[in-house]
């Protein structure tokens, strides 16, 4: 597999294979460089990307289990952003064997919410919006600090059950204190609710 590469000039064509990346492009007003993604229009909550998917300027390329490699190749992306899970690595290796350049997006390994947010700076470096990315982090950090200052004087601190629901199977994935969402809840003065026997960052509960 290819583990290094060189891009001449500003990136104008990318494919992103994780939904968490999409918001970064939108926040940098750079959705126009996204030519393919792993989000269907009906499942997309990033307005500018949803519009791009609907008008055809960006296309759905499938997910790791059903990726359309021929479609991706036809888009001729300068770079493909992938996650760092084992399934993502397998997909990236296949794409790299076809001569496509993949960049691993490691935000999933961050334990702190601000650490995850700062990955927007990687996108900024690729699309020639470094300063805009840094400004975005600085401005949002200031807003977060304002909220946290107000939290300090709050008399009540909630308990929070944070979960995602699977539409393909009857269960809920409840987040634990090993997940980065705990940094959000605890910073805001809350306490995350989860089964104390849990050892991973989430635990599956059936309906």
What positions do the PLM features span?
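A short, structured surface patch at a secondary-structure boundary
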Residues: 1-73, 79-86
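Short acidic active-site motifs
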Residues: 67-68, 90, 204-207
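Extracytoplasmic substrate-binding proteins
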Residues: 13, 57, 70, 74, ...
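Alpha-helical, coiled-coil/dimerization segments enriched in small aliphatic residues
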Residues: 171-206
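Short, structured coil segments at secondary-structure junctions
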Residues: 30, 98-100, 188-189
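Short, surface-exposed amphipathic charged segments that create phosphate/polyanion-binding patches used
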Residues: 52, 117-122, 175-176
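Long, compositionally biased, intrinsically disordered segments
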Residues: 5, 12-17, 28, 38-40, ...
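Amphipathic alpha-helical segments that form well-ordered structural scaffolds
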Residues: 24, 71, 122, 180-187
């Amino acid at each position: 597999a290819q583990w290094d590469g060189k891009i001449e000039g500003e990136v104008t064509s990318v494919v992103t294979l994780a939904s968490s990346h999409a918001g970064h492009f939108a926040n940098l007003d750079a959705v126009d460089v996204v030519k393919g993604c792993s989000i269907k229009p009906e499942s997309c909550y990033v307005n500018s990307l949803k519009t791009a998917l609907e008008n055809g300027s960006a296309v759905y390329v499938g997910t790791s289990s059903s990726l359309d490699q021929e479609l991706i190749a036809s888009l001729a992306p300068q770079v493909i952003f992938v996650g760092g899970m084992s399934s993502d690595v397998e997909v990236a290796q296949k794409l790299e064997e076809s001569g496509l350049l993949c960049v691993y997006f490691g935000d999933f390994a961050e334990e702190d919410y601000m650490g995850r947010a700062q990955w927007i700076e990687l996108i900024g470096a690729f699309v020639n919006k470094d300063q805009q990315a840094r400004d975005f982090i600085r401005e949002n950090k200031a807003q977060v600090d304002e909220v946290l200052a107000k939290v300090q004087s709050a008399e009540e601190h909630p308990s929070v059950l944070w979960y995602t629901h699977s539409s393909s199977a009857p269960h809920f994935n409840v987040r634990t204190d090993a997940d980065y969402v705990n940094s959000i809840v605890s910073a805001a003065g809350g306490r995350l609710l989860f089964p104390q026997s849990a050892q991973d960052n989430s635990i599956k509960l059936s309906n």
